[in-house]
Amino acid sequence: MTILRKTHPLMKMVNHAFIDLPTPANISGWWNFGSLLGLCLIIQIASGLFLAMHYTPDTLTAFSSVTHICRDVNYGWLIRYMHANGASLFFICLYLHIGRGIYYGSYSYTETWNIGIILLFLTMATAFMGYVLPWGQMSFWGATVITNLLSAIPYIGTDLVEWIWGGFSVDKATLNRFFAFHFILPFIIAATAMVHLLFLHETGSNNPLGIPSDCDKIPFHPYYTTKDFLGMILLLAFFFTIVLFFPDLLGDPDNYSPANPLNTPPHIKPEWYFLFAYAILRSIPNKLGGVIALIMSILVLALLPHIQTSKQRSLMFRPISQFLFWLLVADVLALTWIGGQPVEPPFIIIGQIASLLYFTIILILMPIAGIIENKMLKW
């Protein structure tokens, strides 16, 4: 008798991706974050769907519809806070996933890595548009400031901004189209994640040693399904601790005030997961230069496969590169802190130094460290 999971056209796809998939025997907990990101996406789509049933994308009623969800809908407060904090959880997992990819040299799988960068851009776009929807003060002013950055594009900038706004300022048309895009993008993310997996399974997973593991593979199920399940339980425990005990820990108090175009908040800043990029944007006095630096802060990841000089893939046995990696992590945390501070001394110069260090580590110091380590090993 043939096994159904190996013959049925649909089951066969699932089998090859999650059951009989040959997986390196030595991958660590850092490889859990792919499946955890899948869980985050499911949480976001499910909670978002229920929120969309009660939300109205209109400048007059958007804020009160969110209040209505929290007060009058059964467990509406829970769904709303799950969705808001789910975004933070998504980005925590995303940044850890990218960090693991850099540390263990997973960027050598160029197609998988590039699709991952596209996924990061899509997720950032979705999160930004979602932040606008409650129509609080920070929603409105965040949307105004960030969309206005496009006006830095020479010649067509102003027309482009007004086209995106659907008028001469952020208004009803903007809110409506942002809601439409915010609804459709997670499904595009899900489809792109499938392509990400497709490319990954063409090459197989990397491992902590960064060496080929074809001679030592084990089936994904039961070894890694149980490991992923444990990761999911721990993640959900952390998630619900935040949602149920500290739901507003990661949000901005200004967003509890309805949007008012006549009253600018003292400090306009995005959600915490964009602060590092926002700090890089602000560290350059020129508008167009700042926008280019902002985009490059993410796009620089696409250069990693092309500027690797070391003959070892992983950083596991490369102490100089390890030091630079953790310096980069500290630098990103410093940028995140600076992004939330007002634009005044000493924060301006700290932000500029941290921004310069960010690009210097990735583009100059890491490749030089790779060459030095090759020489030390007489390679």
From Swiss-Prot:
Cofactor(s) named in the record: heme b
Listed transmembrane segments: 33-53, 77-98, 113-133, 178-198, 226-246, 288-308, 320-340, 347-367
GO terms assigned for molecular function: metal ion binding; ubiquinol-cytochrome-c reductase activity
GO cellular component, as recorded: mitochondrial inner membrane; respiratory chain complex III
Bilayer disposition of the protein: Multi-pass membrane protein
Binding site for heme b b562: H83, H182
Main location: mitochondrion
Cofactor: binding comment: Binds 2 heme b groups non-covalently.
Keyword terms: Electron transport, Heme, Iron, Membrane, Metal-binding, Mitochondrion, Mitochondrion inner membrane, Respiratory chain, Transmembrane, Transmembrane helix, Transport, Ubiquinone
Binding site for heme b b566: H97, H196
UniProt keyword Iron present: yes
Binding-site positions, a ubiquinone: H201
Pfam families: Cytochrom_B_C, Cytochrome_B
GO biological process: mitochondrial electron transport, ubiquinol to cytochrome c
Subcellular location: Mitochondrion inner membrane
Recorded family membership: Belongs to the cytochrome b family.
Function, in words: Component of the ubiquinol-cytochrome c reductase complex (complex III or cytochrome b-c1 complex) that is part of the mitochondrial respiratory chain. The b-c1 complex mediates electron transfer from ubiquinol to cytochrome c. Contributes to the generation of a proton gradient across the mitochondrial membrane that is then used for ATP synthesis.
Assembly mode: The cytochrome bc1 complex contains 11 subunits: 3 respiratory subunits (MT-CYB, CYC1 and UQCRFS1), 2 core proteins (UQCRC1 and UQCRC2) and 6 low-molecular weight proteins (UQCRH/QCR6, UQCRB/QCR7, UQCRQ/QCR8, UQCR10/QCR9, UQCR11/QCR10 and a cleavage product of UQCRFS1). This cytochrome bc1 complex then forms a dimer.
Other comment: Heme 1 (or BL or b562) is low-potential and absorbs at about 562 nm, and heme 2 (or BH or b566) is high-potential and absorbs at about 566 nm.
Protein name: Cytochrome b
Source organism per UniProt: Dipodomys elephantinus (Big-eared kangaroo rat)
Lineage, highest ranks first: Eukaryota, Metazoa, Chordata, Craniata, Vertebrata
Gene: MT-CYB
